Amino acid sequence: MRKHGEKTYPHECCGFLLGTREGETNVLSEVHAAENERQESRETRYLITPEQYKRADAYARSRGLGVIGYYHSHPDHPAAPSGYDLDHSCWPGESYIIVAVEQGKSAALNSFTKPDYTQFEQEEILVED
C-alpha cells in the first residue's frame, strides 16, 4: 500500500484488502492493487470499477479469502477519512485503510471501519504472516 501510494503520487492509489474475519476483527492476508479508473480529480478521488471488484473477489475466493475492505492514499493530506470518504466508502464491517503520502513519501497509515453508516472509527487490523 505504501509503495503503491508513492508510485501513483500525486494521484490517489486504491486497492483491495483480502483476508478473513475472526469475530469482529478483519485479518489481512493480501493486498490487491487496483488501477484508479477515475478520469478527473485523481489527486483527491479514486474509482474502482465493478469489473475490478469481480476480478479481485474471484482471486480472493480462489485462495480461500474474501474482500474484507479497501485502501487508498491521501496525497499531501492526513491518513484520516474525509467527508467524501464517509459518504462514498465501505459497508459496515469492512476495513478502510488510508495511507498518507507526503511529497511522494509514505507517511502515516491508519485503518478505519464504519460500524454503522454515520461515522468512521479507527480500528486495529490483524496482518497475517
What are the language-model segments listed below?
Residues 1-67, 76-129:
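Conserved beta-strand-loop surface patch within small alpha/beta domains used
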Residues 70:
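Conserved, mostly hydrophobic/aromatic
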Residues 73:
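Residue-level "edge-of-site" marker
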